[in-house]
Amino acid sequence: IAFQSRTTTDQTPKYLFSPPGVKLPLFPVVEPIHDSIVLVEGIFDVINLHDKGLTNAVCCFGVKNVTTEKLQVLSVQGIQRIDVFLDNDEAGQKGSEAIRKLCEEVDITTRNIAFGDKYADAGSLSQTQVDKLRNKLYG
């Protein structure tokens, strides 16, 4: 059993785990759309996307929780592409690059999703924005 919490301030790290150092799985297990998933940082991001119909969203509980082992499991499950949608801040963009490099090691392609608004993230998207995103990703 493990617990995860997230700070609501600018404190780093954003995500705290108990017991310290525990590695949580990617959550939830989903059916891919066109052999792909959307990877987001936090639980509220994934809840918002699922609630608005983008049901192949998966949360990593923070960038440092993504490992080649977890990506290999996704590959075995048939995932061929990960659409990375991390927070649109400097840390999120660095995290997107780190995840892209890990995905290259296991032959999973990536696309980076970024909104022009610095503060836009998956947890703050409206229904209209999620519909547009889904249409752009999957037609």
Q: What is each model feature region?
A:
Residues 1-77:
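Phosphate-handling DNA/RNA-contact segment within nucleic-acid enzymes
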Residues 39, 80-91, 114:
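Acidic beta-strand-to-loop metal/phosphate-binding motif
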Residues 94-105:
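Short, aromatic/basic amphipathic alpha-helical patches
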Residues 109-119:
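A generic structural motif
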Residues 120, 124-139:
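Short, small/acidic-rich helices and loops at N termini and domain boundaries
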